């Protein structure tokens, strides 16, 4: 798993957005998939409004990437970034049997750290 975030996201805004990309890898494109993924993470980190990313993939080829952004404008700008658009097209042609993208607003966060609970709730706590 690759992650850019600290357990309690010091310095992140009270509310932010998550882009959840869930995908099933196809049997082709292995030689360039990792290179493309690494490049996209590097580019995303350079985008204004980017906060962090988490990536995980199971042995069954299903992966989940969650990227975090300050607002929907930052997400839209990332979606329209030229090299990212080319990678999206390559993903449809070579890398994935299917994928789903969801965008969610994060209004609360809780984390477990070594036996302490960090409660970074920004809403009511009733979520």
Segments (PLM) and residue ranges:
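Short arginine-rich
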Residues: 89-91, 95-97
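Residues that form generic nucleotide/phosphate-binding pockets
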Residues: 20, 87-90
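Short S/T/G/P-rich N-terminal loop/turn motif that feeds into the first structured element of a domain
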Residues: 1-62, 72-80, 96-127
């Amino acid at each position: 798993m690759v992650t850019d975030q600290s357990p309690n996201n010091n310095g992140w805004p009270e509310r932010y957005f998550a882009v959840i990309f869930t995908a099933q890898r196809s049997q082709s494109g292995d030689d360039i998939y990792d290179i493309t993924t690494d490049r996209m993470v590097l580019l995303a980190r350079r985008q204004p409004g980017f906060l962090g990313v988490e990536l995980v993939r199971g042995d069954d080829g299903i992966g989940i990437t969650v990227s975090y952004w300050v607002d929907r404008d930052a997400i839209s700008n990332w979606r329209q970034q030229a090299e990212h658009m080319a990678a999206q097209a390559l993903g449809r042609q070579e890398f994935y049997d299917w994928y789903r993208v969801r965008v969610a607003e994060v209004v609360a966060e809780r984390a477990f750290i070594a036996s302490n609970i960090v409660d970074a709730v920004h809403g009511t706590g009733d979520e």
